[in-house]
Amino acid sequence: MSEIHTYIETLKKIGINGIQIIQDGQEIGCFMKKEYKRQNQYSITKSFTSAAVGFAIEEGLFELNSKVCQLFDEAIKIEDPYWNMMEIRHLLTMTMGLETPILMGDSRKTLKESDWVSYVFRQKVTEKPGTVFQYNNAGPYLLGVLIQRKTEKNLIEYLTPRLFDKLEIKPLEAEFCPKGYVFGAGGLQMNVRELGKFGQLYLQRGKWKGEQILSEKWIEESTKKQVECGDYNNSQVDGYGYLFWHLKGDAYMANGKYGQYCIVLSD
């Protein structure tokens, strides 16, 4: 325990906002610069979108191999063969094959488009879906939109009874697009302990207080390496799952843009 304390004290000196360490279901170390203050977790949001997709598939709203263009009115008339072969799994694995990443970072603030769904479907697909990894916010965004259209509840409202209530997390603040859809690729705000519950749920393969909240099979599939991700700028990353990063040594993580991490170690 003294080593944990020393480690946390070292991290505090370099200016981190918070850290929690959980082992065997118990918190063994925690620091929060501002107690319980929620902060933007950026792309960690994607892993919550992954969980929402798991619930949606289990409830029969769509399937992993459902064709994306058949699920959106904006795409019905698209004739491009690559667009028409694109499946839900390609949105989850960052293998849509778009010509360029879109809806990234600060570019959303200056984007003149008000209809982001139509904007996505106007993009060129230059690689066969499923063949090339390209980190892109378009896929997670479409997944959040799809769930809202299928259920008439936005991503937060959809996850509240299925996930947040179970974990005793008050509904999270989120980023919204101009049309009122929760941005499924970034913007969720939570504190360290709330994020820790999410990681613990995944470590426990979807079980919480004796209840199977999320499919064990879905967690296994979404956190294992589905695709290679090339020369990612983290030497511990060795692949990508369904909106989760797979790490060397049987571990995985949700990862935000500015040093936000939720790392799950199975050992």
Explain the meaning of each model-derived region.
Residues L142-L146, G186-K207, Q260-D267:
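Active-site-proximal alpha-helical segments within enzyme catalytic domains
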Residues L98-F176:
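A small/polar active-site loop signature that marks catalytic segments
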Residues E220-S266:
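Active-site Gly/Thr loop motif
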Residues K37, Q41, E79-Y82, K128-Y135, ...:
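Solvent-exposed loop and edge beta-strand segments that line ligand/cofactor-binding
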Residues G60-M94, L98, R122, K150-M190:
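Active-site helix/loop module of the DD-peptidase/beta-lactamase fold
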Residues I8, C69, R89-L92, F121, ...:
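Non-transmembrane alpha-helical segments in soluble domains
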Residues I4-E35, Y261-V264:
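A short, well-structured edge-of-sheet supersecondary motif
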Residues G25, N40-N65, L91, L143-I147, ...:
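Active-site SXXK
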